């Protein structure tokens, strides 16, 4: 895509062929699906797969993470939500937790420790093999999303755990990610399609996607260092497009 004051926006492919706006919309149907649908030009199928505006919207996502996001000082307390509320909508969290050689829950309404819940979560986590202290963790405790998957936590032995609160009780699963990988950074995703659980990077700056069934897939890209690089992922029901950059550009 080229833009100039004199000629406006022009669109070309790798061979130099120029396309009109309407043609370009059809080349990227999952990106311009609303425009195509409004003009009755959205196909019924793409690559043999049925598509509707709802299906496309459900599969589209954008993920962005900068080095600043990773390098920021981490809070001592992390809010935790109820992943299975009584009502259909997620509720604002009323509790937070801190981790030391155990996990401790604090009721944010009166700043008191919930000893019963703290003991229960701590017991279950340790029964599942969790070794404190926590090396790193990632969660997104906001009700402005469709669902909640709690936290991905990396324990002291580089094992990756999935921890969330369901009906006030602990949900703790070891994901099976090999400790030998030395996972150093995790980012929970919670995309609308509910296919993935998070993105992980190891000690060698390899990038992985962790699916909801805890299967792990290494992405075939160059090294990605979360401490110095920026990462942008745009995905749809067919493909992921990744862009890795730094202070000097892409």
For each predicted feature, which ranges?
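Soluble catalytic regions of membrane-associated enzymes that act on cell-envelope
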Residues: 49, 54, 94-98, 102-108
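Structural motif
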Residues: 9-13, 100-116, 157-164, 204-211, ...
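Beta-propeller fold detector
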Residues: 114-127, 171-179, 211, 217-225
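Conserved beta-strand positions in repeat-built beta-propeller and related beta-rich domains
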Residues: 98-100, 154-156, 191, 200-203
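Conserved beta-propeller blade signature
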Residues: 95-97, 150-152, 161, 197-199
